[in-house]
Amino acid sequence: VTSISRIADEVVEALKPEETTDGVTRTISYWDPLGVCACITPWNFPMGMPQTLMMPSLIAGNTALFKPSEEVPLVGIEYAKILNKTLPSDVLQVVVGTGEQGRELVESDVQLITFTGSQATGKHILEHAGKGLKRVLLELGGKDPLIILEDADLDAAAKFAASNSFRNTGQVCVSTEKIFVM
């Protein structure tokens, strides 16, 4: 709940009308919802990733088609049931299945696609989304460095490196994968 409140606060702030002027003219920019957003999430954080990817779209007034990983479809279905208790009817719908259903979702008439997963799948999404000039947000796995500076507490850095490298069996896009000591 705290995370959703934080996300809501950030979205509301980001969507405030922006006013600019050059002294002669005044322009006010308003943000409108995009429409239907596809949210394709990985298996390793079956509630955290959908929340991070989907909630901003919903709070901004969009609808969402949520495709959880085929490894954890029941978690996605149950999470959507919880959210749908407070959302208007049909604002959030779940699509379950394999990559084939993901491809069909990407090729459907959605305005935004969010995806966290492999680079190979991300490339396919970009290829198909580009044909429809769809907006795309991708997180394709990082190669995250831990940078240890000269004045660092080496014991604390070593503990952090070990725990962060193997968190969730090391299958986290922000796990430490390399260490630079300055």
Regions found by a protein language model. Name each.
Residues V1-M54, L87, V91-Q93:
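N-terminal Rossmann NAD(P)-binding subdomain characteristic of aldehyde/semialdehyde dehydrogenases
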Residues D32, P50-G102:
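PLP-dependent aminotransferase-like
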Residues R26-T27, V94-Q111:
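A structured beta-alpha segment of the ubiquitous adenosine-cofactor-binding alpha/beta core
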Residues C37, N44, V96-E104, G117-H124, ...:
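Beta-loop-alpha module in the N-terminal Rossmann-like domain of NAD(P)-dependent dehydrogenases
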Residues I4, G76-Y79, L105, I125, ...:
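Hydrophobic packing residues within well-ordered alpha-helices of enzyme cores
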Residues L87, L112, A120-M182:
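ALDH superfamily catalytic-core signature
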